[in-house]
């Protein structure tokens, strides 16, 4: 290929795939430059390498550049000569990093990876136990390699005595047995993989036992993988060992005169010593025992070289630590993969402290002159030479050191339009590195624009940042067009602006837009903005005065439903007028006190209406305005501004009374200790909430002697500038309840606040929480980082690869409720998705959205306005793209608001979006200092609309007071309107007391039912007398003597066949009903007591209490993504149908039978101690929980299918994040879940050659079936050469038949092939990442040894489709600008476009970057893309 054809980068790296396989002995010799015969390294007197030693110059190349060992040839002129005296080739000393040597072994050894790493490949292949194999390899036992005519078995182990006895019995030469690696090699040589594979398949079809099947499949896998590769099994036994280049295992002379050496040299030295000794012994014809011992030691020393940690006794170094072997070099965080290949460092960068740069524009940063001078050095030198200030590089450098005047002028020129990258560690998401245009500043600190801080998560309390300089023109263009801070206005995780004002800016904007009564000039009317400005400047009106204003003709008032009219007269304040003057033309008039949320909203609005440029200007203006106004306001706060409400004491007294009341009730035995504890916590929580509410309103309406007063503390908190209600409550209200480190809540609250000061006791009880907060932070950061790493690894190769995969599947998205409140509206949950079907307005018949069209925020609002609850959209979880995802299934790129582009690395973005808040949230605990924010428990349901009551699936009994008590678990109250349509439905918990009857008319706000929030009652359904059964003290029940002197019976965790229950009998003693008692239930009746329906027999505590923060959340997220089975799982119904609970037990478990309408019966075994959620006669749906406990995602997948488990996992993840008020778009979770469900397990192989029970990628599986459909199975061969049952391609079949018929023979008959069937597997992310199709990616993640062993045996080929493999090999990643389409496209310029460009007035930016169009968008180019893989 001529130079002209190659593109601008080196084609040497342009290989498309990487293959790994076993090295043949001749390969190892071919790599080598000579045999290492001596264990010596270097001569301690001359410090020159010893000949034929481990550092020999003849083998590995010269120590000094262009100089042979003896010094006969010196200098470049002898390049390539081989010295006749010392045999060294004259060349560069760099070759000592490349040239390898070898060691010829006197006896073969087995590679430790193949027999010691579990599962043992050799053991599997030979069907031997690993322990037996080790006995043979380490010369303890003989193995029979050929029994000939004797009674011995093949592969039978014989001890020394047995071997001797057998030889005497059968005579020498009558059978063959051997030990050591030679024996293993003999056995491997005798394997015929093809027949073995057929035999195994036959055995597999015949066997019935599950374990046998598993073993056979494992063995078959290895046999087939070796058979299909070019490997021979005997290559696992080595004759020759490669020696790695000496500069990769250096020996360094220290100042003290000692040598520091790599551990590998010691390991090689042991091998060479033992090998040479073995040679001598063989030559001397030493006794067998001695030779055998030497061979064993050789095997052990080779094992230590390859993998020292797997040896029985690892070789120890000087300080009693195991030496680092070759395996340790590549695995783990410090190994080759993660330290050197994935963790490369930039060789020239600067770092310094950051300070705020309020005068910078959004795309700028301030760079200290020192840093700029150093970073831009080569560019400056080039310019100095061009301008003739310096002749040589050396003189130019001198000028730089002297800091001459010309240098500064040139520096100014060089930095224009040459962006720099700023990075702040930890870089948790892509906003951690952004590009800026540098401006030179004095001093040593980097100046950073305040608005980009949120993306970097930076503050100015001493944070440091690193500066990098993109060098090539491509890198500069990328930095400019893609990474510029102006392109990162919106967060890719949720599409909200990440560059929204905070702190002082918010405070300034809020202060200027606040209105106050009784100010100077109240009630004046103005016709234009200018008049208001004039009046304000003259002091006729104040900033907060209430005035009237006529809006300009082009502006309307901002309202939620966009109904304002243009040019209306509005009530506002001069401050708000000033704020709105700052907004660009085309925006509505925001007539409200601007809190941080409103400011963020205004930025989103601006972007949607006026585009990116206007938004950037708005951000800069908003910052200037905010800073200016907050300075002018002169806000600060004093202790007096922390207003404690006067009602505080009264609330505390009430709470204390309440606590006393509960204590008395407890003493009289009316409630359990647990109940009392919960009620006490509740009383204090109520008091605290009430005090807080009063405190906030007192601050809001703060009136001081001088009239109205803006309370600065309230202003900061309310505007969202700093400090939450939580913190103010602790300063001015009441600190409230504290948590112990266990998460339990201490029931005596802290009644004081920080302003009043804490007593010693109060201070002591708050140290718990504070300390836990700090400890948590330290521990959880690591966990969160690990989660991010696992997510990134599992999703790294998900890139947008095509426009539309053409799938017809999707997922249902709807409103998300939390309790009764709408947590996510429909518009929010479908925004940015692609609709699966077209949606038509039934009233007007207009198409709101077409099928496969993206739903914009506007369309989403229209769909919601139609009153739909759910719609179907495309999702990455059902995408059919064989690689990555397609644009339609992904939808909108959240950071730009338009359809995602091909080549976008959406997997990494998903991983960052989920992982980044994990780290954030782990760090959030300590700000509040452990004070508990316990939710007040709900204990009733109120209607939110009017309607008529319908009760569904409800079973109830009437108690003594005549109220209905609900018995069922899944009962619902539905409200219907006058047309009978359902408007609301509420799930009713067990044991709730109904306040309404069927058909009642209710109004909004009416109570439908009430319940005790702390316990679930177990109620009697019949009238009768109580008899206890299996309630045995000390075995199934414990008597709790409470402090009040009462005793309580509590059911405890029990083993064996006792099943505690309450039996209700009639007068004759006939049992009417048996009520099973679950663990932790307390019995509320006495033996022999008469009961009536609705009477409480026992109580179960409801799960409440404890503090929920994401520390509980992070492990939960990990648990979901790892698809772990929960500790104490629920049993779910396998089919729809009616429940019957059997009284007899199997193996100590109770049985629930579910009968479907079609008569299918399924038994469900329930471990004892579980609380049943269903009763006999209930109707259940498949997948519904029958007993308490967490659901198992694998069960959901098995019973109710993929969509159900997808929805479940997504919902669970979102619940954790939403409870922390972290918004993450669903699609990020969906991408990860799609990776977890990508593998299938072969159930029945059909006529394919897949292995039943093996796990594979669903697309490979689908392809295998599709290929099979192009074939035909021979049923009757006729006169053809086919045999019955073979599979042949259809074309060949037809052709052969045509030929046979032409000859007058009988054609073959064929039948359709049977496809394979498989079931979807749910894998945890770690497992999914390790099972990646790319062995390079998997090996660099975890379990390196295992992955590489497997890949080498199978001769795997890595196609380099993911990002990680390409990073490791130093290629461009196949995403973004490195994506196939962009790499292969050519740009054709349109003549007219070029002419237009040449006439347009050009900005400085465009001069340097002609690629940038007017709005920072690329200029239009027609690209002829060469398609095709």
Swiss-Prot record:
User: Could you tell me the Gene Ontology terms of the biological process aspect for this record?
Assistant: DNA-templated transcription
| Polar residues compositional bias, start-end | 1419-1429
Query: What reaction gets catalysed by this protein?
Result: RNA(n) + a ribonucleoside 5'-triphosphate = RNA(n+1) + diphosphate
List of residues binding Mg(2+): 459, 461, 463
Q: Does the keyword Magnesium apply?
A: yes
Query: Do you know which Gene3D superfamilies this protein is assigned to?
Result: 1.10.132.30, 1.10.150.390, 1.10.1790.20, 1.10.40.90, 2.40.40.20, 2.40.50.100, 3.30.60.280, RNA polymerase II, clamp domain
Annotated GO MF terms: DNA binding; DNA-directed RNA polymerase activity; magnesium ion binding; zinc ion binding
Residues that hold Zn(2+) 2 according to the record? 805, 879, 886, 889
The UniProt keywords, alphabetically, are: DNA-directed RNA polymerase, Magnesium, Metal-binding, Nucleotidyltransferase, Transcription, Transferase, Zinc
Which EC numbers characterise this protein's activity in its record?
2.7.7.6
Asked if the record carries the keyword ATP-binding, the reply is no
Region Disordered, as annotated, extends over 1407-1429
Q: Name one GO cellular component term.
A: DNA-directed RNA polymerase complex
| Bridged cysteine pairs (disulfide) | none
| Family statement drawn from the similarity comment of this UniProt entry | Belongs to the RNA polymerase beta' chain family.
| This protein's name | DNA-directed RNA polymerase subunit beta'
Q: Which organism is it from?
A: Rhodopirellula baltica (strain DSM 10527 / NCIMB 13988 / SH1)
Q: Which gene encodes it?
A: rpoC
């Amino acid at each position: 290929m001529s130079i002209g054809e190659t593109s601008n980068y080196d084609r040497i790296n342009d290989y498309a795939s990487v293959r790994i396989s076993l090295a043949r002995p001749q390969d190892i010799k071919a790599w080598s430059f000579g045999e290492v015969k001596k264990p010596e390294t270097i001569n301690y007197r001359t410090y020159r390498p010893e000949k034929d030693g481990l550092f020999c110059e003849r083998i590995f190349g010269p120590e000094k550049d262009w100089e042979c060992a003896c010094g006969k040839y010196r200098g470049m002129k002898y390049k390539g000569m081989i010295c006749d005296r010392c045999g060294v080739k004259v060349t560069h000393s760099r070759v000592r990093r490349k040239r390898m040597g070898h060691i010829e072994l006197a006896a073969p050894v087995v590679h430790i990876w193949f027999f010691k790493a579990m599962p043992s490949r050799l053991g599997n292949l030979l069907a031997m136990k690993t322990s037996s194999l080790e006995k043979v390899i380490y010369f303890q036992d003989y193995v029979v390699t050929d029994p000939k005519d004797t009674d011995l078995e093949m592969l039978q182990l014989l001890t020394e005595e047995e071997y001797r006895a057998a030889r005497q019995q059968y005579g020498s030469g009558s059978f063959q047995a051997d030990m050591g690696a030679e024996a293993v090699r003999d056995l491997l040589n005798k394997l015929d993989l093809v027949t073995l594979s057929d035999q195994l398949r036959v055995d597999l079809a015949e066997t019935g036992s599950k374990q046998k099947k598993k073993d056979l499949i494992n063995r078959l896998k290895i046999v087939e993988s070796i058979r299909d590769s070019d490997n021979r099994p005997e290559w696992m036994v080595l004759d020759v060992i490669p020696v790695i280049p000496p500069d990769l295992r250096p020996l360094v002379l220290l100042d003290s005169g000692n040598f520091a050496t790599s551990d590998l040299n010691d390991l090689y030295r042991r091998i060479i010593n033992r090998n040479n000794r073995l040679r001598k012994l063989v030559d001397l014809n030493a006794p067998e025992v001695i030779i055998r011992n030497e061979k064993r030691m050789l095997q052990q020393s080779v094992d230590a070289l390859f993998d020292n940690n797997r040896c029985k006794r690892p070789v120890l170094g000087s300080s009693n630590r195991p030496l680092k072997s070759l395996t340790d070099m590549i695995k783990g965080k410090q190994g080759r993969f993660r330290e050197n290949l994935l963790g490369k460092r930039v060789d020239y960068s600067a770092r310094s402290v950051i300070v705020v740069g309020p005068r910078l524009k959004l795309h700028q940063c301030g760079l200290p002159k020192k840093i700029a001078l150093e970073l831009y050095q080569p560019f400056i030198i080039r310019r100095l030479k061009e301008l003739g200030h310096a002749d040589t590089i050396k003189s130019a450098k001198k000028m730089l050191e002297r800091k001459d005047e010309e240098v500064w002028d040139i520096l100014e020129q060089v930095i224009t339009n040459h962006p720099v990258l700023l990075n702040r560690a930890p870089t948790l998401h892509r906003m951690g590195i952004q590009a800026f245009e540098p401006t030179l500043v004095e001093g040593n600190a980097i100046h950073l624009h305040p608005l980009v801080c949120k993306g970097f998560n930076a503050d100015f309390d001493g944070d440091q940042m690193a500066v990098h300089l993109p060098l090539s023109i491509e890198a500069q263009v990328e930095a400019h067009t893609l990474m510029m801070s102006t392109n990162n206005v919106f967060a890719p995780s949720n599409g909200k602006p990440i560059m929204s004002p905070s702190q002082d800016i918010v405070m300034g904007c809020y202060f200027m837009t606040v209105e106050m009564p009784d100010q100077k000039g109240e009630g004046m009317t103005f016709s234009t903005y200018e008049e208001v400005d004039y009046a304000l400047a003259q002091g006729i009106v104040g900033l907060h005065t209430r005035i009237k204003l006529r809006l300009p003709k082009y502006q309307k008032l901002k309202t939620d439903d966009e109904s304002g009219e243009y040019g209306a007269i509005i009530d506002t304040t001069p401050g708000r007028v000033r704020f709105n003057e700052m907004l660009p033309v085309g925006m509505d008039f925001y007539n409200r006190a601007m809190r941080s949320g409103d400011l963020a909203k205004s930025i989103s609005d601006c972007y949607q209406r006026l585009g990116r440029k206007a938004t950037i200007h708005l951000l800069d203006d908003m910052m200037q305005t905010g800073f200016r106004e907050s300075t002018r306001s002169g806000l600060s706060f004093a202790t007096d501004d922390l207003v404690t409400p006067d009602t505080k004491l009264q609330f505390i007294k009430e709470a204390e009374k309440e606590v006393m009341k509960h204590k008395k009730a407890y003493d009289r035995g009316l409630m359990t200790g647990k109940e009392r504890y919960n009620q006490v916590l509740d009383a204090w929580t109520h008091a605290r909430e009430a005090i807080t509410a009063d405190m906030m309103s007192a601050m809001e309406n703060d009136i001081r002697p001088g009239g109205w007063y803006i309370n600065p503390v309230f202003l900061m908190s309310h505007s969202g500038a700093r400090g939450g209600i939580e913190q103010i409550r602790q300063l001015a209200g009441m600190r409230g309840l504290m948590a112990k480190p266990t998460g339990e809540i201490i029931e005596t609250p802290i009644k004081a606040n920080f302003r009043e000061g804490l007593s010693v006791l109060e201070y002591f009880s708050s140290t718990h929480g504070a300390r836990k907060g700090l400890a948590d932070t330290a521990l959880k950061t690591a966990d969160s980082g690990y989660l991010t790493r696992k997510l990134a690894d599992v999703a790294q190769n998900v890139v947008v690869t095509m426009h539309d995969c053409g799938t017809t599947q999707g997922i249902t998205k709807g409103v998300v409720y939390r309790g009764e409140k709408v947590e996510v509206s429909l518009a929010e949950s479908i925004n940015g998705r692609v609709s699966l079907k077209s949606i038509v307005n039934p009233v007007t018949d207009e198409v709101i959205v077409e099928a496969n069209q993206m739903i914009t925020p506007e369309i989403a609002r229209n769909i919601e306005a139609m009153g739909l609850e759910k719609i179907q959209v495309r999702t990455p979880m059902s995408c059919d793209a064989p690689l990555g995802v397609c644009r339609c299934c992904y939808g909108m790129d959240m950071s730009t608001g338009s359809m995602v582009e091909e080549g976008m690395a959406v997997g990494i973005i998903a991983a960052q979006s989920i992982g980044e808040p994990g780290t954030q949230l782990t760090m959030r605990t300590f700000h509040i200092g452990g004070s508990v924010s316990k939710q007040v428990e709900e204990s009733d349901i109120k209607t939110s609309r009017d309607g008529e009551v319908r009760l569904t699936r409800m079973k109830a009994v009437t108690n003594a007071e005549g109220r209905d008590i609900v018995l069922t678990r899944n009962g619902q109250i539905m409200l219907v309107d006058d047309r009978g349509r359902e408007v609301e439905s509420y799930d009713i918990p067990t044991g709730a007391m109904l306040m309404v009857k069927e058909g009642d008319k209710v109004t909004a706000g009416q109570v439908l039912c009430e319940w005790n929030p702390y316990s679930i009652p177990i109620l009697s359904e019949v009238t009768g007398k109580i008899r206890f059964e299996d309630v045995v003290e000390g075995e199934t029940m414990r008597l709790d003597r409470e402090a009040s002197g009462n005793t309580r019976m509590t059911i405890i965790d029990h083993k064996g066949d006792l099943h505690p229950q309450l039996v209700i009998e009639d007068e004759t003693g006939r049992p009417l009903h048996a009520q099973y008692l679950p663990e932790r239930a307390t019995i509320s009746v006495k033996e022999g007591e008469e009961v009536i329906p609705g009477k409480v027999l026992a109580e179960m505590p409801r799960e409440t209490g404890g503090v929920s923060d994401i520390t509980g959340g992070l492990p939960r997220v990990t648990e979901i993504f790892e698809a772990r089975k929960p500790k104490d799982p629920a049993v779910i119904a396998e089919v729809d149908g009616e429940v019957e609970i059997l009284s007899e037990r199997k193996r100590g478990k109770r049985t629930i039978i579910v009968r479907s309408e079609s008569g299918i019966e399924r038994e469900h075994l329930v471990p004892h101690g579980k609380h049943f959620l269903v009763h006999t006669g209930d109707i259940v749906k498949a997948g519904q929980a029958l007993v308490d406990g967490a659901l198992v995602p694998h069960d959901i997948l098995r019973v109710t299918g993929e969509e159900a488990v997808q929805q479940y996992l997504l919902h669970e993840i979102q619940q954790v994040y939403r409870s922390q008020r972290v918004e993450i778009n669903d699609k990020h979770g969906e991408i990860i879940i799609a990776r977890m469900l990508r593998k299938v397990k072969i159930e029945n192989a059909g006529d394919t050659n897949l292995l039943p029970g093996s796990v594979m990628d669903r697309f490979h599986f689908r392809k295998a079936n599709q290929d099979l459909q192009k074939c035909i199975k021979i049923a009757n061969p006729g006169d053809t050469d086919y045999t019955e049952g073979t599979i042949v391609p259809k074309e060949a079949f037809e052709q052969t038949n045509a030929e046979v018929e032409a000859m007058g023979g009988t054609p073959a008959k064929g039948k359709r092939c049977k496809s394979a069937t498989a079931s979807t597997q749910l894998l945890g992310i770690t497992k999914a990442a390790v099972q990646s199709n790319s062995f390079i990616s998997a090996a660099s993640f975890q379990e390196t040894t295992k992955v590489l062993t497997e890949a080498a045996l199978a001769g795997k080929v890595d196609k380099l489709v993911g990002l990680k493999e390409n990073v490791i090999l130093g290629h461009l990643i196949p995403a973004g600008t490195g994506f196939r389409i962009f790499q292969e496209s050519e740009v054709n310029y349109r003549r007219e476009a070029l002419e237009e460009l040449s006439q347009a007035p050009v900005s400085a930016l465009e001069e340097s970057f002609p690629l940038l169009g007017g709005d920072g968008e690329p200029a239009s180019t027609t690209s002829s893309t060469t398609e095709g893989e």
